[in-house]
Swiss-Prot record:
Family annotation (Pfam families): LacI, Peripla_BP_3
Ranges where the HTH lacI-type domain occurs: 2-56
Organism: Vibrio campbellii (strain ATCC BAA-1116)
Name of this chain's protein: HTH-type transcriptional repressor PurR
Pathway: Purine metabolism; purine nucleotide biosynthesis [regulation]
GO molecular function: DNA-binding transcription factor activity; transcription cis-regulatory region binding
UniProt cross-references to InterPro entries, sorted A to Z: HTH_LacI, LacI/GalR-like_sensor, Lambda_DNA-bd_dom_sf, Peripla_BP_I, Tscrpt_reg_HTH_PurR
Known function: Is the main repressor of the genes involved in the de novo synthesis of purine nucleotides, regulating purB, purC, purEK, purF, purHD, purL, purMN and guaBA expression. PurR is allosterically activated to bind its cognate DNA by binding the purine corepressors, hypoxanthine or guanine, thereby effecting transcription repression.
Subunit: Homodimer.
Keyword Transcription regulation in record: yes
Binding site for hypoxanthine: F73, K189, F220, D274
GO biological process: negative regulation of DNA-templated transcription; purine nucleotide biosynthetic process
């Protein structure tokens, strides 16, 4: 494996000059730069990240802890984070925990051992023990994204789920719907509790009673949406609209309802949450609550960089504002 001395020898310059060319730390004449880079290419030289990290006290590596990277919402946020990491010369280590306690614990330990410069956390079900573990690594800058836990050591970006739930339900009410169901994720999750609270607030403002049999529990995946669609189809009195707490469930619900002979939106209206890319191209295109996923990723990374530069900065909370994207799955009844 080639060393910096080999590059310097081939280029006919000092190792210091090679270092300045590679790290862009000082002006070097263009002809000299060309000689150095030609030698780098010929020798297939790669600087030692370990040596650089020891010298600079930085690995230029970010760890990202996520509940489920295959979830379409998460994958779009991850795409935003990765894009901005790449532009800034950082490597992203993605840790997909699957919501498993042991994996969350072990990944946090592993990221600490790898001396990452910072950690992004996007987990909906961190326990108190895990929150304490994050706090124990107080020397590592952290930003918590989406509906993760509060931490005394981390900046936080919140998605304002209560307001999003309110906006979705109010839109249905404004279009004449009074019999409105909601398909939640697991009831114990903070985001679901907030979206249900927003749903109830909009119903209460309109003096509409909530049918508790229509507050359905899912898991943010298609399988429970299919079960919910079968349940709704079999109801003697059906809701005229369903507010789904993410687009994945909304699309699964729509597909099954239409298999069961119910047309969306002619027979039943559906509104989703997240505005994943697929929502626009489904048939019919899904009306949904937009969350700026790539902007969340960008903001999280930028905030983390600020935290890396100023570790003593007091904890901050940044709030994202949800907004409705109107397409073709809500029927106007008034």
């Amino acid at each position: 494996m080639a060393t910096i001395k080999d590059v310097a020898r081939l280029a006919g310059v000092s190792t210091t000059t090679v270092s300045h060319v590679i790290n862009k730390t000082r002006f070097v004449a263009e002809t000299t730069q060309e000689k150095v880079m030609k030698a780098v290419d010929e020798l297939n030289y790669a600087p030692s990240a370990v040596a650089r990290s020891l010298k600079c006290n930085s690995t230029r590596t970010i760890g990202m802890l996520v509940t489920q990277s295959t979830n379409l919402f998460f994958s779009e946020v991850i795409d935003g984070v990765e894009s901005y990491c790449y532009r800034q010369g950082y490597t992203l280590i993605l840790c997909n925990t699957g919501g498993i306690y042991e994996k969350q614990r072990d990944y946090i330990r592993m990221l600490a051992e790898k001396r990452v410069d910072g950690i992004l956390v996007m987990c909906s079900d961190l326990t108190e023990e895990l929150k304490e573990m994050l706090d124990r690594h107080s020397d590592i800058p952290k930003v918590v994204m989406d509906w993760g836990p509060e931490s005394s050591q981390a900046d936080k970006i919140i998605d304002n789920s209560e307001e999003g739930g309110y906006i979705a339900t109010k839109y249905l009410i404004d279009n004449g719907h009074t019999d409105i169901a909601c398909l939640s994720g697991h009831f114990e999750k903070a985001a679901c509790q907030e979206r249900i609270a927003g749903y109830r607030r909009a119903m209460a403002e309109a003096n509409l009673a909530v049918n508790e049999d229509w507050v359905l529990e899912g898991n943010f995946e298609c399988d429970t949406a299919v079960l919910a669609a079968d349940n709704i189809t079999a109801m003697e009195k059906r809701p005229t609209a369903v507010f789904c707490f993410n687009d994945t469930m909304a699309l699964g619900l729509m597909s099954r309802l239409q298999q069961n002979g119910l047309k969306v939106p002619d027979d039943i209206s559906v509104i989703g949450y997240d505005n994943i890319e697929l929502a626009e191209y489904f048939s019919p295109p899904l009306t949904t609550i937009h969350q700026p996923k790539r902007r969340v990723g960008k903001n999280a990374f930028e905030i983390l960089l600020e935290r890396i530069k100023d570790k003593e900065h007091e904890k901050r909370v940044f709030e994202m504002q949800p907004e409705i994207v109107v397409r073709n799955t809500v029927k106007k009844l008034n």
